[in-house]
């Protein structure tokens, strides 16, 4: 099942984080936030730290600076309102775990990654869109646009746009389709997410 279309995009969505707090909602602050995360990303990916420690470091970064709950709720859409408390809790757990494993399962592929900020543009109440070029050894550069929100008083990544396509909107459509195929049950999505997480865990183990 295709819950995430691009491994690189899905992994990076939870990585470029944990910049020094920037209170000003400006393109410059957002660009500095993303640029600092490019440096932090390379340090972790290019290190010889054991895989489990790398994963934990990325998990800490993710929890501190991405609006995981906000993005997760957006992706689930109207189904968030109909989900039970237990389903919501399990969904949030699986959503975060999948973000982390999407990256850790690809640590080897991402080693040697190059990351450059090219511009930043205000997007009104949404925040600031920061454009970057990401290069992997032996592959053509990929343009990724990061939507940074300052609504909480500090920068938080709330979306990633690749080739004009919003990751959170794409995920929302895919998750909704899974629920529809499952008879409208959020539980059907949770089952699919567990399967995906298990596959990512196996892929991570194969790197060792």
Predicted features and spans:
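Sec/Tat signal peptide C-region and signal peptidase I cleavage site
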Residues: 20-24
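Bacterial N-terminal signal peptides
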Residues: 11-17
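Solvent-exposed loop/turn segments at secondary-structure junctions
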Residues: 80, 97-98, 122-123, 136, ...
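N-terminal export leaders
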Residues: 3-9
């Amino acid at each position: 099942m295709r819950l995430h279309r691009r491994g690189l995009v899905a992994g990076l969505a939870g990585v470029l984080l944990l910049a020094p707090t920037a209170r000003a909602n400006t393109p410059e602050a957002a660009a500095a936030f993303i640029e600092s995360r490019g440096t932090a990303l390379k340090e972790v990916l290019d290190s010889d730290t054991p895989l489990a420690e790398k994963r934990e470091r990325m998990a800490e970064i993710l929890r501190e600076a991405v609006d995981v709950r906000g993005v997760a709720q957006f992706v689930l859409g109207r189904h968030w309102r109909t989900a039970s408390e237990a389903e919501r809790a399990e969904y949030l757990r699986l959503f975060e775990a999948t973000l982390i494993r999407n990256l850790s399962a690809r640590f080897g592929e991402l080693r040697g990654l190059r990351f450059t900020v090219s511009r930043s543009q205000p997007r009104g109440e949404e925040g600031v869109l920061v454009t970057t070029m990401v290069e992997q050894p032996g592959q053509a550069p990929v343009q990724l646009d990061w939507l940074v929100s300052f609504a909480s008083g500090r920068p938080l990544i709330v979306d990633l746009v690749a080739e004009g396509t919003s990751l959170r909107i794409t995920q929302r459509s895919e998750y909704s389709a899974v629920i529809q195929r499952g008879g409208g049950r959020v539980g059907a999505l949770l089952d699919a997410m567990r399967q995906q997480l298990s596959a990512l865990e196996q892929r991570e183990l194969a790197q060792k």
